[in-house]
């Protein structure tokens, strides 16, 4: 089982694909998501988003605020900017 993940900024789709784990920092603290996670919505703070792809590689992105949502093994990360 995998997560369908999309990381987008106002100007581009930064990353899209399947992952086994996603982590990010929200205003409520660090958050980790595995397949089967309950639905949630969070507000991102500036910091790292980590995506572990189904191939075992991990991608790290530095985001500047935004939103994080999980529903039915779909993770959407909408950020103001990515470095």
Regions found by a protein language model. Name each.
Residues 2-83:
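Compact, glycine-rich, soluble single-domain proteins
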């Amino acid at each position: 089982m995998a997560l369908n993940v999309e990381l987008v900024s106002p100007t581009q789709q930064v990353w899209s694909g399947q992952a086994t784990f996603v982590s990010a920092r929200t205003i409520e603290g660090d958050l980790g998501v595995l397949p089967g996670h309950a639905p949630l919505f969070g507000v991102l703070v500036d910091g790292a988003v980590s995506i572990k792809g189904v191939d075992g590689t991990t991608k790290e992105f530095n985001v500047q605020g935004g939103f994080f949502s999980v529903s039915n093994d779909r993770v959407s990360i909408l950020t103001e900017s990515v470095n």
